[in-house]
Amino acid sequence: MLHPALALVPGEPAGVGPELCVRLVQQPRQDCRLVAFADPATLQAAAAALDLPLRLLPPEALAERPGDLPIQAQCHVHPTRFGHPDPANAPAVIAALCEAASDCVHGALHGIVTGPVHKAVINQSGIHYTGTTELLAAQAECDVVMMLANPHLRVALVTTHLPLRDVPDVITAALLERCLRIVNTAMCGDFGIATPRIAVLGLNPHAGEGGYLGREELDVVIPVLQRLRAEGMVLLGPLSADTAFLPTKLIGYDAVVAMYHDQGLPVLKHSGFEQAVNITLGLPYPRVAVDHGTALDLAGRGVADPSSLFAATALCARLAVSRALLSVRS
């Protein structure tokens, strides 16, 4: 399979997702076939705002010219007003994600590319929602890891959206081991690295300084690393986060595992925010998302940067091909 079929889910309809999707399909793709799971009227309105062509096709059709986009319609209750989210449309946003995921699980599609979703708006609708990563993991009934990547760096997270005061209690040996196994498997299978070198950051300053600045490294991190190294995994650390991202050290890693959100992601975003993407490791299909928010203040103005969506789509296509080739070999 060298031309995978990918679901394209714009996310929050009042944000920049729809117009970024319109920009994405202005050039026919050679690496994948895209099927949008979205509200047709919203996409048409985005195309009109950008003064770009858009021809919506049946979901099984092939895109043949600029602006062609097969679509599995997810109609909204109320018309979209760019910049003004409507909680009444939140069920359609969730339905688009769930239907796309179901099609991937059943083999009709080979991966999902997602735009930014507005968590607060979905929760205001009465739907409990913590994030797309968690939603897809629950639907697939599997453990997942969030990884953000750009052309220079890959950073996976042991914990994601938690208050900082809660992080030490959440990081258990079982959680850390599960995270490292998922990252190692993904680096081997999805990214084709036979023996990935994974840098693991410590939780505390200076990785605990031998216990003087916290015992989590001694009590949790080091025993897990020793156990997994005995199985053959190449794990570096625990490393002090303040020097782990020096360029001379990064050349020795294939991925970095950070203990919490703001330990690793500021460095990644500083090194290449426009090309950064969010990858969900551990799902039975590739899912790659943009690494930015809904940008309600930019929606409908035609000024939003599509670079992250372009990068997410290209990477998702490559990962889908890697999975197919791995399946053939096994």
Swiss-Prot record:
Pathway: Cofactor biosynthesis; pyridoxine 5'-phosphate biosynthesis; pyridoxine 5'-phosphate from D-erythrose 4-phosphate: step 4/5
Binding-site positions, a divalent metal cation: H161, H206, H261
Cellular compartment(s): Cytoplasm
Residues binding substrate: T133, K269, N278, R287
GO biological process terms held by the UniProt record: pyridoxal phosphate biosynthetic process; pyridoxine biosynthetic process
EC number in record: 1.1.1.262
Superkingdom of the organism of origin: Bacteria
Cofactor binding notes: Binds 1 divalent metal cation per subunit. Can use ions such as Zn(2+), Mg(2+) or Co(2+).
Cofactor: Zn(2+); Mg(2+); Co(2+)
Catalysed reactions listed for this entry: 4-(phosphooxy)-L-threonine + NAD(+) = 3-amino-2-oxopropyl phosphate + CO2 + NADH
Key words, A-Z: Cobalt, Cytoplasm, Magnesium, Metal-binding, NAD, NADP, Oxidoreductase, Pyridoxine biosynthesis, Zinc
Major localisation: cytoplasm
Single GO MF descriptor: NAD binding
GO terms under cellular component: cytoplasm
Function: Catalyzes the NAD(P)-dependent oxidation of 4-(phosphooxy)-L-threonine (HTP) into 2-amino-3-oxo-4-(phosphooxy)butyric acid which spontaneously decarboxylates to form 3-amino-2-oxopropyl phosphate (AHAP).
Family per similarity comment: Belongs to the PdxA family.
Entries under PANTHER family matching the protein: 4-HYDROXYTHREONINE-4-PHOSPHATE DEHYDROGENASE
Further remarks about this protein from its record: The active site is located at the dimer interface.
Complexes and interactors: Homodimer.
Classification via HAMAP family: PdxA
NCBIfam families named in the record: pdxA (TIGR00557)
Protein name per its UniProtKB record: 4-hydroxythreonine-4-phosphate dehydrogenase
Organism, scientific name: Xylella fastidiosa (strain 9a5c)
Taxon lineage: Bacteria, Pseudomonadati, Pseudomonadota, Gammaproteobacteria, Lysobacterales
Gene that specifies this protein: pdxA
